[in-house]
């Protein structure tokens, strides 16, 4: 999806979100999907969530730092019927002396902690919430 032109990218993202409605392991699918995003060093400002892009601008812009990937995972799940009523928070956490941005779903499931995998809140030592939806 990430190598497509903007309208095709939006369509492919919609098709992926639709596939999550019946997926056996939707969190793992989201982790794998966003692991293919092209990575940049810095895109979003942690201190200005009000200036973060909406879901479609994020996908169209095609720039993904660690925070943008966590936000993209959040938008992907939020825009499904299956997960639209769930609780989503983005936290900072330390992994091997590296600051990470993670998505926490329903105070239980953690995405973007480790590449291509799903973790649990119990795997995190300490986090700081920076945004919730």
Regions found by a protein language model. Give the residues of each.
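A structural boundary/capping signal
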Residues: 1-133
């Amino acid at each position: 999806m990430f190598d497509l032109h903007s309208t095709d990218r939006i369509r492919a993202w919609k098709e992926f979100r639709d596939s999550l409605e019946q997926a056996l392991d939707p969190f793992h699918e989201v982790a794998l999907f966003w692991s293919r995003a092209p990575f940049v060093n810095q895109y979003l400002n942690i201190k200005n969530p009000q200036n973060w892009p909406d879901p479609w601008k994020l996908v169209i812009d095609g720039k993904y730092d660690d925070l943008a990937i966590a936000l993209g995972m959040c938008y992907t799940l939020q825009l499904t019927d299956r997960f639209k009523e769930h609780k989503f928070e983005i936290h900072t956490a330390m992994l091997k002396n590296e600051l990470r941005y993670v998505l926490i779903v329903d105070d239980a499931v953690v995405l973007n902690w480790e590449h291509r995998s799903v973790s649990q809140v119990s795997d995190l030592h300490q986090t700081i919430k920076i945004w919730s939806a």
